[in-house]
Amino acid sequence: MNVSKRLMGLDFGKARIGIAFSDIMGFLATPHSTLKRTNEEDDIKYLTNLINEKNVDTVVIGLPFEMSGNKGEIANAVEEFANKLKESANVKIVFVDERLSSVEAEEQLKQTIKSWEKRKQLLDQVSASIILQTYLDTK
C-alpha cells in the first residue's frame, strides 16, 4: 500500500523556526507550530521526529534573498542547517525565495487578530505556510 507523504514548510530564523505542513494530497499548506530554537542539535532532532511522525518526504525551506536578488546574510546558515536536516531525516530539501513572506503573513494576521502579541506568536508558522503554499502552487 502506498501511503501519501506530506510536505513540511520551514521559515528559518535565528530565534524561531516556523513550521507548516501540506495536506496529504499536496494542495494546501497549513500553519502547524513555531519552534523556539535552543541549539542546532536539538532543533534538528525535534524536526526529524516531527518529519517521521507526520510522514514527510520533502521539506520546503524559505531562503532569504535580498530585494536585489542576491542571497541574504542568513542564507548560508539556512543552507547548512538544511543539509544537516537532510542527513538526519533522509528527506528531499527544496528552497523557495522567501522575500516578503513575513510581510504577507503579517498582513494576513492583521485582518483577523488585533493583538500584536498574538500575531507575533503565529507569525513564523503562518510565514512557513506561505513559503510552502508558494511551492505547492508552482508544482
Model-identified regions with their sequence ranges:
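Phosphate- and other anionic-substrate recognition elements at nucleic-acid/protein interfaces
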Residues: 2-8, 15-139
